[in-house]
A protein has these predicted regions:
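Active-site entrance/lid segments in N-terminal catalytic domains of soluble metabolic enzymes
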Residues: 1-125
């Protein structure tokens, strides 16, 4: 076990976050990562809210470890984003956004549910 600020924040035992690799970031993979001590991530981009909920519920049934939700924001309909993010934030301790700056209203939804908002960047430039 390696304790860091990251492990303290997300509740994992090793400071590793699974890369949310599109369709490969399934509930089974995320739960395996969480069982190994890392932060598992389920990619929920493009799914309706009930599928987001079902995928995260499935991952949580497979592991007691922390499992987050990932949104590739270029593929999320802005009109449905609040409902999707709320469904994820109710079930995941971390909600991760990628590619564009997350809308502050979405971050507020995440925080209101008691989850952490994370912004994945593609490069330092």
């Amino acid at each position: 076990m390696l304790t860091t600020r990251f492990t303290d924040l997300v509740g994992c035992t090793v400071p590793i976050q699974q890369a949310p690799i599109g369709g490969c970031a399934s509930p089974r993979l995320a739960s395996a990562v969480a069982e190994a001590g890392g932060l598992g991530m389920v990619s929920v981009t493009g799914d309706p809210p009930e599928v987001v909920a079902a995928q995260l519920d499935q991952a949580r049934q497979l592991s007691a470890g922390p499992i987050g939700a990932h949104f590739f924001m270029l593929m999320v309909d802005p009109d449905s984003a609040p409902e999707l993010v709320a469904a994820a934030a109710e079930r995941a301790p971390v909600v991760d956004f990628f590619y564009v700056d997350p809308d502050p209203a979405l971050v507020e939804i995440v925080h209101a549910a008691g989850a952490l908002a994370s912004w994945q960047i593609g490069s330092a430039e």
